[in-house]
């Protein structure tokens, strides 16, 4: 991680941190060094999603937001009954994990519904249902990317696995390392070559986009969980399940499936 070059004010404890590049923390008999990166700028005071006046959703067991959730970061609604964000290092790590999982979930949800929608409108796929598509690798003709044999033609699960590891690993390594020259200071919002449209040029608009990204990402993670459950219970894709529900809501609904579900059948 990039080291801080200015004095920091901790939003978790309200205490001034010493203006040094590294913070030393003693652990047992030894000593570990923890490097913290300063945010480039604080969230805009004019946004309703930041600061003490932001919308709060505290849940049934919290009367007020904890002191370490001050509204500095996007998606902070003041709810942390379990105290998962109390430790600054853990909070920073969890924020990064949430954003990365949100982005993958949004891509995944789009990838689950798009082939089914296209197939329903006449586009030919070998298999449009997301959890069945991978099995086409073992079919006689293999799996054609986007149903086109002139693109990627896959017949080896090991080759697909290797490509996934290499490509995804390269992208994540590129992001975490700060790009080819290590110029990126914030691995969550790297900007630069990762922002060719310049969406982060305006700080006010960028702060709003961070909130929108997390909102949509959280919904996408719940959606993916729902797709997993649907696949196990009904054996159908999300679009087909939606069509069945709209055709007969009284029969095709979550309650009916939950009360009649028998594992293994």
Swiss-Prot record:
Cellular location(s): Plastid, Chloroplast thylakoid membrane
Keyword tags: Chlorophyll, Chloroplast, Chromophore, Magnesium, Membrane, Metal-binding, Phosphoprotein, Photosynthesis, Photosystem I, Photosystem II, Plastid, Thylakoid, Transit peptide, Transmembrane, Transmembrane helix
Any one Gene Ontology BP term: photosynthesis, light harvesting
Predominant location category: plastid
Cofactor descriptive note: Binds at least 14 chlorophylls (8 Chl-a and 6 Chl-b) and carotenoids such as lutein and neoxanthin.
Binding site residues for chlorophyll b 1: 57
Transmembrane residue ranges: 151-171, 219-239
Annotated chlorophyll a 6 binding sites: 245, 254
Binding site for chlorophyll a 1: 79, 85, 98, 218
Binding site for chlorophyll b 5: 164, 261
UniProt: chlorophyll a 4 binding residues: 216
Residues reported to bind chlorophyll b 4: 164, 175
GO cellular component labels: chloroplast thylakoid membrane; photosystem I; photosystem II
Residues holding chlorophyll b 2: 103, 152, 181
Post-translational modification: Photoregulated by reversible phosphorylation of its threonine residues.
Binding site for chlorophyll a 5: 212, 230
Biological function: The light-harvesting complex (LHC) functions as a light receptor, it captures and delivers excitation energy to photosystems with which it is closely associated.
Known partners and oligomeric status: The LHC complex consists of chlorophyll a-b binding proteins.
Family: Belongs to the light-harvesting chlorophyll a/b-binding (LHC) protein family.
Record PANTHER family: CHLOROPHYLL A/B BINDING PROTEIN
Domain remarks in the Swiss-Prot or TrEMBL record: The N-terminus of the protein extends into the stroma where it is involved with adhesion of granal membranes and post-translational modifications; both are believed to mediate the distribution of excitation energy between photosystems I and II.
Name of the protein in its database record: Chlorophyll a-b binding protein type 1 member F3, chloroplastic
Organism of provenance: Polystichum munitum (Western sword-fern)
């Amino acid at each position: 991680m990039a080291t801080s070059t200015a004095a920091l004010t901790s939003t978790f404890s309200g205490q001034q941190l010493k203006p040094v590049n590294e913070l030393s923390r003693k652990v047992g008999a030894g000593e570990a060094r923890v490097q913290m990166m300063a945010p480039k700028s604080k969230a805009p005071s004019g946004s309703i999603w930041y600061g003490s006046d932001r919308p709060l959703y505290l849940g049934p067991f919290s009367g007020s937001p904890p002191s370490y959730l001050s509204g500095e970061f996007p998606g902070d609604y003041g709810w942390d009954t379990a105290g998962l964000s109390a430790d600054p290092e853990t909070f920073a790590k969890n924020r990064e994990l949430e954003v990365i999982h949100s982005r993958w979930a949004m891509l995944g949800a789009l990838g689950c519904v798009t082939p089914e929608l296209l197939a329903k409108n006449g586009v030919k796929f070998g298999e449009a249902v997301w959890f069945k598509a991978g099995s086409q690798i073992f079919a006689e003709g293999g799996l054609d990317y986007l149903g086109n044999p002139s693109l990627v033609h896959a017949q080896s699960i090991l080759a697909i696995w290797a490509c996934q590891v290499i490509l995804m690993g390269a992208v994540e390594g590129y992001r975490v390392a700060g790009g080819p020259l290590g110029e990126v200071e914030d691995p969550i919002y790297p900007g630069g070559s990762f922002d060719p449209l310049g969406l982060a040029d305006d700080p006010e608009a960028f702060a709003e986009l961070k909130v929108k990204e997390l909102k949509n990402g959280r919904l996408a993670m719940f959606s993916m969980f729902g797709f997993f459950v649907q696949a196990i219970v009904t054996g159908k894709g999300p679009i087909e399940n939606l069509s069945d529900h709209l055709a007969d809501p009284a029969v095709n609904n979550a309650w009916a499936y939950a009360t009649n579900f028998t594992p293994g059948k």
